[in-house]
Amino acid sequence: MIKALLPVVAMLLLLATPSSTPFAQPAPLPAGLKAAIDGPQRDPANRLRDRYRHPLETLSFFGIREDMTVIEISPGAGWYSEILGPLLREKGKLILAGSASPALRARVADQSGMLGKAVLLDFRPPDFSLKSDPTQTPQGADMVLTFRNVHNWISAGTVQTVFAGMFRAVKPGGILGVVEHRANPALPVDAKAANGYVHETQVIAFAEAAGFRLAARSEVNANPLDTKDHAAGVWMLPPTLRIDPAEREKLLPRALATGESDRMTLKFIKP
């Protein structure tokens, strides 16, 4: 998975402000957003995660619209993709870049299905040559989104490169939306983000070093129950529940009661 993240930059290079406010109000809801979230195309297991991931509030906060070209970086199994696809299929465009599960690849291949005309950009290490869709927007995307991936880039040593690539991917005035597991600010920064948590100040610094400006931050994905001191890191919590079998009886109830991790939700603008 980590190897697939470096080539994202090659794709981003091909795609061609408001002052920072502490907690801005979300933009008006696109008409089709709630319909996409409530739609029958979604996996029932994914719906169960809405209580922790707040897709309606999160995407509204980022200011998504149906007519945008949106890049989702490292979509994985497509938790957000199955919302973004129906939302953008008529007037906009969805580009999925980086690692994607076989099931998500199959859904992209079915152009008549849930993801419609979505494009999956594939990469071929070690030369990272891009096999891209010639119809993709050359002047840049309206929005780049990434959900719970920054710790992987830190661990791989590619975080500055990826943020620089995301900056090049969006047009001036374009948006970068980031959701990430949030570290305890009282603890030292872990240079490898080994437990999956990242300091909010780190993410802001990475984005600003690439050229973005922080537009707003939201607490919509905050979880004050998360103590962030788990032996297996963030993966001890749902949905992974990576718990030592010898400790499972004791720790599983705690993990389930906590829910998913405490997360930062940050919106950046390209000047």
Task: Give the residues covered by each predicted segment.
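Conserved beta-strand signature within the Rossmann-like core of class I S-adenosyl-L-methionine
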Residues: 173-181
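C-terminal lobe and adjacent flexible extensions of AdoMet/dcAdoMet transferase-like proteins
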Residues: 251-271
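A short glycine-rich, Lys/Arg-flanked "PGG" loop and its adjoining helix->strand segment in the class I
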Residues: 85-86, 159-172
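Class I SAM-dependent methyltransferase SAM/SAH-binding core
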Residues: 74-133
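Class I SAM-dependent methyltransferase Rossmann-like catalytic core
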Residues: 33-61, 65
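Conserved class I S-adenosyl-L-methionine
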Residues: 66-76
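A short, conserved alpha-helix within the catalytic core of class I
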Residues: 130, 152-165
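A short acidic, Gly/Pro-enriched loop at the edge of an enzyme's catalytic core
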Residues: 131-144
